[in-house]
Amino acid sequence: MYPSNKKKKVWREEKERLLKMTLEERRKEYIRDYVSLSTILSWKEEMKSKGQNDEENTQEAPQMKKSLSEKVSLYRGDITLLEVDAIVNAANASLLGGGGVDGCIHRAAGPCLLAECRNLNGCETGHAKITCGYDLPAKYVIHTVGPIARGHINGSHKEDLANCYQSSLKLVKENNLRSVAFPCISTGIYGFPNEPAAVIALGTIKEWLAKNHQEVDRIIFCVFLEVDFKIYKKKMNEFFPVDDNNEGTDADMKEDSEGPEPKGLSPPHKKSKAKKPESSKDSSEDESGPEEKQTAEEMEGQSQEAGGLRFLLRNLLGLIHRDGVNTTPVPSPASEDKAEVHKDEDSAKDDNTVKDSDMTNHSVCDQELPNGQENDSAKSEGKTEAESPSSSMETEDLSPNQEDAAIVEQPEVIPLIDDQEAQEGGEAQGKDAPAVFAESQGSSEAENTSGPDVDMNSQVDGVNEPTESLQEDLQ
């Protein structure tokens, strides 16, 4: 069937020879017809040719913007006839040929393709390997192994199918190939549903083209069945619309080729946009600056005042503490009231003791005196109770010795300096009171035993003697 294949025995030599030939030299050795790339319209050209005249196309052609639809084409026919840089073979894992498109490519390429594939040691699912095209119009053949779905697909099947297209496009870029044709991978005997397979193929290639727009001139979707052709024709408008411009993809391409921009640099329009918020921030900072300064100064003043008050309080507390330790404490109103109460109690005790002594002495005298004399004694008692010890009446009745004793005794009884002296004075008087009573009683008894016939003068002297004994005891 392919008589020229009998002459080719060593695949390495044949590969080197064919790869060194020009396109014209290779065409002389084609055994079959071929379809050149120039005869295949891009998707954009095909869509514009429908419903528009040639004149309109020529007028609008200079105004057209570049889009991804210029990079893709839809072709229905035999993939082995395409004169492109590479065609993709939907191979099996052994890469030794099989049914469907794989068998067609091996038969058209000749025995050298099989010989080279034997040295590749097979291929994994989702991966791809490249060989020479040999007797094919295509310069290279890229072999990829698709997933075996058999009518039921899952996430791993979709991922493997997408990897088939990505791996093939990677080899295209690495070998500097400008055109490539893809068949429908895994849709034949492998049982991958046609429409999901078309969606994965179109989406994966569009994503790659957006990043590698300048790396290829044409990617061809080659279908053989009517079902696949209708599906692709419908989906092509969705993935590659004619009005879609590629300005964004060009910018992405430049960024990928030139590398990421430094962080410190940005495009001019971005700088102008960034300056406006900075100026507004500066103005807002300037406006809020005086207020913040004023608040800061007020806070500092308040803190200083608080610190000064604390310092004064500490000093006052220190002075109070020192005064309490080294000097006599300042009497409080409560302590003064207590001192006055103690003084009143002490004076009351003194008065009571004097009264008691007088009452005892007078009671003894009254028992011995007549009724007329009892009245005189009562009168004298009333006078002594009403008058103070320092009155003029007492000084007249008392003798000169008694007057000196009374003058000496007055400062000891009347004023008290402090609480301690008042307490001590009260205790001393309390102790002396019984002695006074005892002595007064003894003297009165001694005088009363002298006899009932004592005259009036002696009785009057007996009335005054208790005061003398009291004064002597106090001395």
Swiss-Prot record:
Macro domain ranges (all copies): 59-240
CDD domains: Macro_OAADPr_deacetylase
GO BP terms in the entry: brain development; DNA damage response; peptidyl-glutamate ADP-deribosylation; protein de-ADP-ribosylation; purine nucleoside metabolic process; response to bacterium
Tissue specificity of this protein: Expressed in the kidney.
Covalent cross-link Glycyl lysine isopeptide (Lys-Gly) (interchain with G-Cter in ubiquitin) as placed by the record, residue numbers: K170
Pfam families named among the record's database cross-references: Macro
E.C. code: 3.5.1.-, 3.2.2.-
Catalysed reactions, as listed in the record: 2''-O-acetyl-ADP-D-ribose + H2O = ADP-D-ribose + acetate + H(+); 4-O-(ADP-D-ribosyl)-L-aspartyl-[protein] + H2O = L-aspartyl-[protein] + ADP-D-ribose + H(+); 5-O-(ADP-D-ribosyl)-L-glutamyl-[protein] + H2O = L-glutamyl-[protein] + ADP-D-ribose + H(+); alpha-NAD(+) + H2O = ADP-D-ribose + nicotinamide + H(+)
Keyword Hydrolase: yes
Positions of substrate binding: 77-79, 90-92, 97-102, 185-191, 224
UniProt entry keywords in alphabetical sequence: DNA damage, Hydrolase, Isopeptide bond, Nucleus, Ubl conjugation
Annotated family: Belongs to the MacroD-type family. MacroD1/2-like subfamily.
Function: Removes ADP-ribose from aspartate and glutamate residues in proteins bearing a single ADP-ribose moiety. Inactive towards proteins bearing poly-ADP-ribose. Deacetylates O-acetyl-ADP ribose, a signaling molecule generated by the deacetylation of acetylated lysine residues in histones and other proteins.
Name of the protein described by the UniProt record: ADP-ribose glycohydrolase MACROD2
Source organism of this protein record: Mus musculus
